[in-house]
């Protein structure tokens, strides 16, 4: 794992491996985090919330510079594999650590498994696009979440025997935790009611660096809805909004929430505005209207058959879709194929050579 969101996808995998081992299967796993055990993005309750073990090892590579981080992971993960040999290295998503660890494994003659393979933005200026393409090209097992990802891989000449449509593993985590969610303490203090607030998440620096665009987006939100707006934001985002004078009596800015508390806010929202692909997927699973501040979706199924709409960075489009939401005319979504909570089981069965 290379970042906090990766753990939402490794948690069900660790449980599936534990279950397979308990059933007598010859399988063990070692969880590696490329960052530090003092990483402030990993809240103290994260691993308890996800019901998963803490990483077995932290590589302590925290550089923000791409090349230094890449080099640090290459060296540290090579040392890890020398000390703890593996038959398969499974990497998640499309981050710099994903690519770096797959390169190390391949150079050492170890099989690479890519979880959430085949996602494409078709924009080579996006670092994630390069990371994903390189990782997919090195992988022996390509675990996909949807048929669009399968098609992307097919179009690049990937051997179909290596592609395994296992479903969306994030849904495994969502299904597992639906009865474990925790109402944030601030929920009652703010006087919020379920299905009567708009949830807003914002993280991407590319948008935060565009002052005029950001102000126009918030203007559209505040003009087009009279509901409370709940926004769990990192300090750098909060400071940016403050510097731009973006404020309202209906805008409730919270600190980043623990996993189960944030899940509660997502589950009970009237609508969601986000720049997170994971949140958009969760919204489709829950049938909640979602407006994504991006021009592409990692899983296009959230748009074609789910509840997600891409608005890019256009305040005009956002205003239009908020009108649709206000009128109660949002599209009724459906669950994409294999969003059934069994992706992790399929992955383990495939690695054991048992999946049909």
Each predicted region: which residue ranges?
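Active-site and donor-binding regions of nucleotide-sugar-utilizing enzymes
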Residues: 1, 7-18, 22-23, 46, ...
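Conserved nucleotide-sugar phosphate-binding/catalytic loop shared by glycosyltransferases and other
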Residues: 25-69
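A nucleotide-sugar donor-handling region in carbohydrate enzymes
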Residues: 37, 41, 60, 135-210, ...
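Donor-nucleotide binding loops and adjacent catalytic segments primarily
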Residues: 44-47, 182-268
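Short acidic-hydrophobic, aromatic-tinged amphipathic segments that line or gate anion-handling sites
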Residues: 57-60, 144, 253-256, 309-314
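Glycine-rich phosphate-binding loop signature in dinucleotide/nucleotide-binding domains
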Residues: 80-87, 192-193, 268, 354
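A donor-sugar binding/catalytic signature common to diverse glycosyltransferases
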Residues: 91-92, 103, 114-115, 142, ...
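Leloir-type glycosyltransferase catalytic cores
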Residues: 145-148, 176, 309-356
